[in-house]
Amino acid sequence: MKKELTIRFFILYIDSLNLKYQAMKPLKKEDLDQEVFDLYDDYAHSRIERREFVNRLSKFAVGGLTVAAIMGFLMPNYAKTSLFSEADPRLVEETITYDSPKGAGMMKALLVRPKNASGKLPGIVVVHENRGLNPYVEDTARQAALDGFIALAPDALSPMGGYPGTDDEGRTMQGKRDKEEMLQDFIAGFETLKSHEQCTGKVGVVGFCFGGWISNMMAVRVPDLSAAVPFYGSQPTAEETAAIKAPLLLHFAGLDTRVNAGWPDYEEALKANDKTYTAYMYPEVNHGFHNHSTPRYDEAAAKLAWGRTIDFFKEKLT
């Protein structure tokens, strides 16, 4: 009897050590079921409320793993993932304002270019996700500048005071704005960049998530847009697709069933209207794979997609 109790105690002790180890061990995305990332996608796109998100995550809080730990892991960490500083000596950047008469009125945007540039540069409008101009998208604009372009990254939250500092707040704020009005804000940003004294007048657009939809719609609405690169963006209708003049480079995430569901009809419309496009599907990666601030980031796919994007812009804008 005494021996059995000793064995049971030893087993419980080992189990407690395992739980502590699991709690202390750094969480990796490979540790989480794909359903966790799907739930985060639903939450990040306002298809479920925070309470439901937390409740549904609870089934994955096992073996010393807590809901709080999972949520903390899924959320963006800009303090640890920022790629550039505002004082990067290779760049010249400023916050500008421009008028959006068909949109919100006065808009703010980050304007950035390479410091060592000689002469005018082709331009890229960089369009954020559904939560305002956060540090990830600012980093993307800076990277575009280092790659040889003058980049403009507008903030759709400008009429509400700008990006509030957290993505949750930004998403709530952006959800209160009208999509058509925001589209007009980015079209006005295109016109501002096109006429900038340091721009050649050849301008393309790249956008992510909501920004992918904006990129698709700018291709529909802006006849003199030189190129459009939507990353996992919702698609225009077949009727709207007929108006596209700009060449398209489209990036899709293999696990992104929500956005990918609209791709077959979009591709059919592109083919039917003899549009110029190239599309890439990146297998086994999630929506948001280019965003380096969250665990959905996939380094290999992100670098490949961005390299293709820059090559495309250099071909179409220069």
Q: What are the language-model segments listed below?
A:
Residues 197-208:
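Alpha/beta-hydrolase fold nucleophile elbow
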Residues 173-196:
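Alpha/beta-hydrolase active-site loop
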